[in-house]
Amino acid sequence: MTEAPYKAPALEKGLDILECLAGLRTPQSISDIARSLGRSRSEIYRMVVVLETRGYVERTDDPEKLQLSNRLFEVGMRSPPKMDLHEAALPEMSALASRMMQSIQLAVVSSDQIVVIARTESPDDVGFSVRLGHRRSIMKSASGLVLFSFATPVYRAKMLEDLAEGGAQPSDMESLQASAHQVQEAGYACMPSRMVDGVTDIGAPIFDSTISHGAVASLTVPFVVTRRAKVSLQDAPGLVAEAAQRISATLGYSPVSKS
């Protein structure tokens, strides 16, 4: 690695703390962080005070434990690429929610997880949705299955590495790869929710002409059968896939350009 021409030790310590909390995924005490980074508790404490004041880390129910807040996520969403995705997706999400009487969500990959970056509530009194910033393993969601299935081979290999580092079992990763072939053939994923009984998750890939690693996001519907539902579960996947294709077209993507 090329040595940086300038050093900013305080900034480096702050970034190390953020990366540590993101990598460990479970709340950590100041002593835990100091031990992980090989630094003294006092220097970590000073940095944590600043990060907590700025809203980048927060206390859990256990006041001794710290975790990342959604602040980094919120800052990241201000960047132009993500705003372009939002601008293209939100009108289609709103229209799809009204047509299907279902909640709609938009998810992207984050290491070995998916993160929900946008959502539209169901116009119906009954629906299912998760909060913005919600994270879940790639292997435990339709969004994750879609994003894995429609990634390039190189990017899929990277996702598998991240899953292995996160403790995923080889048999589970083999099952994920087998399911990916079926999803690629269908053009969408449709599976019972692994979070809530009675919900069927339907997801379809969104592509961006400026992104080369495959699907940039998953348009996902946690489908709930209600008396007011305007679309049957059998017809829903086609509508979700069509909406995802329109969003992709808005982002300048066409199937011809797919590598």
Write out the residue ranges for each language-model feature.
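Signal-transducing coiled-coil/dimerization helices and immediately adjacent hinge/linker segments
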Residues: 256-259
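Extended hydrophobic
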Residues: 169-246
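N-terminal helix-turn-helix
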Residues: 1-86, 245-253
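Amphipathic alpha-helical effector-binding/dimerization core
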Residues: 62-162
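A structural signal for short hydrophobic beta-strand segments in well-ordered beta-sheet cores
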Residues: 57-59, 106-107, 206
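Amphipathic alpha-helical regulatory segments at dimerization interfaces
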Residues: 36, 88-99, 105, 179-182, ...
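Generic alpha-helical structural signal
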Residues: 12-15, 90, 94, 174-177, ...
